Regions:
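Helix-rich, typically C-terminal accessory recognition domains appended to large enzymatic cores
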Residues: 120, 343-381, 391-499, 609
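Structured secondary-structure scaffolds
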Residues: 1-48, 100-104, 154-369, 411-415
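Cys/His-rich short segments
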Residues: 115-168, 172
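Intrinsic disorder at enzyme termini
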Residues: 470-551
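Phosphate-backbone binding interfaces of nucleic-acid-interacting proteins
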Residues: 531-652
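Beta-strand segments within the central parallel beta-sheet cores of soluble alpha/beta enzyme folds
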Residues: 287-290, 474-476, 576
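N-terminal catalytic cores of NTP/NDP-binding nucleotidyl/phosphoryl-transfer enzymes
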Residues: 2-75, 94-109, 114, 131, ...
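A glycine-rich helix N-cap at a beta->alpha junction
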Residues: 76-91
Length: 652
């Protein structure tokens, strides 16, 4: 029977510079999903690549004194090197400077123009060069790009436009009837409430103010807008031809099963891209997942901030699979994850060296010490064995459930619960005590067999996340590679097999002080100018009348998670947020528009007064109050929980 196909893509990496670990997280996440789908029996096609056109690259190349093509060749090569270093199993690495891609983009643009979806006009507005994005004045936040926070520049030029509004209602209907199309749910609410429902403006899809792009073949002074160019890689990379000569591969693979992208570019993938596909009369991808960011400390990694950590540097310290473990295991499903050198060392020492590495080492060492490395199932079973067996057989199903929902971090946690259970089994059975009694030799053999079998099952489940570690474990145990189907049976390890004589250390423990000293050598901290001591900034406010504890007790404070937010039209101050509080969703209107954009508010955890009597602000019902602090200059700051807390948690 022919295998069911599974087509997965990452966003293609922009070739403005070397990718940091935050960029690298996405390719590793996609690789884990692709590998697991292969384990499940799917015929997987995994595509990634590089996005190589645009004004930003033209300027970078000019600064470097080389041509744009030379510049992107260098950066694309560096990106591919790091993707390969991280042991990612992609099937296609596409470059938007590939001749066949450029040819198809020109044909796609021409087809959209002939269909009447693209027309010629003049663009006047604001442009963010780093994001390659257009904005109106009203979309800017404090005069800056709402996506990256950097300055925008005025742009006025002849341009071609795409009629986005023509397909808006159709896209809204599609999203409403396909609940899994945009995930997580909070991203869908953001796109609907902030962009689609307020109404789409036509999109500028060409530029004349720079040359580094794909020329519009019937009007070559124009180059195709970088996002129209980049997004089409998902179809050109598998052989799409808009003249009807698409490849057999395209006909097999499209629509994509999963576009895996960063949350910062979800608008392009869930609004622009579906509408482009509708224009081409092509089906839409089955799912777009906007993953969170991997932050350094408490901020998004950025070269301009000087807080960048690179994947190859981490690999030099910890090894490939330890880095894969960290970025996959430490990233929540929706909220941003955090990476620090300290946390990496702690996880390596506790989870990898101790929980996993020590388990494998002890098991092999005891097998050699007591039985010369021979592992035999003598069948001397006790209730603790049945408990272990039931536990081990349940784990694959739990992993499958998590992976089906793209909860990769949770899936890894399930795998490590098996390793922890095996460590507990050692404590329960005490092989060293059994070894002292010759009459219990067969019981000891059974215990060690169960350990080897359990580790083999765990190593099989670990393969999608840490493939090299799986190979090393199986080699030391002299165990054959297994399928997920095999994991429905406990006891497939051949009785009488012999494990390796000297166990290899999977993960060596590291000393935090030594690691930090080496990091300091690698990235010396810049000395910041010493500022004169300033008088402490304090604010005295007029005291309000005292209240009793009973009065205060009437107020109810809870943690709320903002799942959607939009500007209140005709108001300069108000934002309207949909706030999840426990199992309920409340609508709350807040006067914070001057301090936070609607996009910034989404996914934030805030403190809310939840038992205020509902009131109308600007004609909109508000069902609570989001708490803020205000300084002497009138600047507002949201009050947020110091630690991760669930939506609905009581504030007391």
């Amino acid at each position: 029977m022919e295998k069911q196909k599974y087509y997965i893509t990452t966003a293609i990496a922009y070739t403005s510079g070397k990718p940091h670990i935050g960029n690298t997280y996405e390719i590793v996440l996609a690789d884990a999903i692709a590998r697991y789908k292969r384990q499940e029996g799917y015929d997987v096609f995994f595509q990634t690549g590089t996005d190589e056109h645009g004004q930003k690259i033209e300027l970078k190349a000019e600064e470097a004194g080389i041509t744009p093509k030379e510049f992107v060749d260098n950066v694309s090569g560096e990106i591919k090197r790091i993707w390969d270093l991280m042991n990612t199993s992609y099937d296609k690495f596409i470059r938007t400077t590939d001749a066949d891609h450029e040819k198809q983009v020109q044909k796609i643009f021409k087809k959209m123009y002939a269909k009447g979806d693209i027309y010629k006009g003049h663009y006047e507005g604001m442009y963010c060069t780093p994001c390659e994005s257009f904005f109106t004045e009203s979309q800017l936040v404090d005069g800056k790009c709402p996506d990256c926070g950097r300055p925008c520049v005025p742009a006025k030029e002849e341009a071609y436009f795409f009629k986005m509004s023509k397909y808006a209602d159709r896209l809204i209907d599609y999203i409403n009837t396909h609940p899994d199309f945009i995930q997580p749910e909070s991203r869908k609410n953001e796109m609907m409430n902030n962009f689609l429902l307020p109404g789409l403006q036509d999109l500028c899809v060409s530029r004349t103010s720079f040359k580094w792009g794909i020329p519009v073949d019937f009007d070559p002074k124009h180059v195709v807008y970088v996002w129209l160019d980049a997004l089409t890689n998902y179809i050109t990379g598998i052989g799409y031809d808009c003249d009807g000569e698409s490849s057999e591969q395209f006909n097999k693979l499209w629509p994509a099963d999963l576009h895996l992208i960063g949350k910062d570019i979800i608008r392009f993938h869930t609004i622009y891209w579906p509408i482009f596909l509708m224009s081409l009369d092509l089906p839409l991808p089955k799912q777009v997942f906007g993953h969170p960011w991997l932050l350094q400390g408490d901020g998004k990694m950025s070269k301009s901030k000087g807080n960048v950590i690179y994947a190859d540097e981490l690999v030099d310290f910890f090894g490939v699979d330890a880095v894969r473990y960290f970025v996959l295991h430490e990233m929540p499903f929706e909220n941003d994850g955090v990476i620090t050198w300290e946390l990496m060392v702690e996880r390596l020492n506790s989870e990898l060296a101790n929980t996993l590495g020590n388990l494998v080492n002890r098991t092999i060492s005891m097998s050699n010490k007591y039985f010369g490395g021979v592992v035999e199932n003598k069948g001397v079973v006790e209730p603790v064995d049945e408990d272990l067996k039931a536990f081990a057989l349940a784990v694959p199903g739990k992993v499958a459930e998590k992976m089906d929902k793209l909860r990769v971090a949770d899936a890894m946690t399930e795998v490590f619960t098996l390793f922890k259970r095996l460590n507990k089994y050692i404590d329960e059975t005490m092989p060293w005590a059994l070894a002292k009694d010759e009459a219990k030799k067969e019981r000891l053999a059974t215990v060690l067999y169960n350990l080897v079998e359990g580790i083999t099952m765990g190593a099989t489940l670990l393969e999608s996340f840490m493939p090299e570690t799986t190979e090393r474990i199986l080699a030391q145990l002299n165990a054959d590679k297994r399928t997920l189907e095999d994991l429905k049976t406990f006891g497939l390890y051949p009785s009488g097999n012999k494990v390796t004589e000297k166990p290899e250390i999977l993960f060596a423990r590291l000393d935090l002080k030594e690691v930090l000293a080496k990091v300091e050598e690698l990235h010396p901290k810049k000395e910041e100018p010493v500022e004169e001591a300033k008088e402490e900034n304090v604010i005295d406010i007029e005291a309000k009348p005292e209240i009793t504890f009973d009065d205060f007790g009437k107020l109810q404070f809870q943690v709320g998670e903002i799942i959607a937010c939009e500007e209140v039209k005709k108001s300069r101050k108000l934002l309207c947020s949909q706030v999840k509080i426990g199992s309920q969703v409340r609508q709350i209107v807040s006067g914070i528009k001057a301090h936070y954009s609607a996009e910034e508010m989404v996914v934030k955890k805030v403190m809310v007064v939840t038992n205020l009597k509902p009131a109308k602000l600007a004609g909109i019902l508000s069902e609570g109050m989001i708490l803020c602090a205000e300084d002497a200059d009138g600047n507002l700051s949201l009050m947020v929980p110091e630690k991760e807390m669930p939506a609905g948690a009581e504030i007391c």
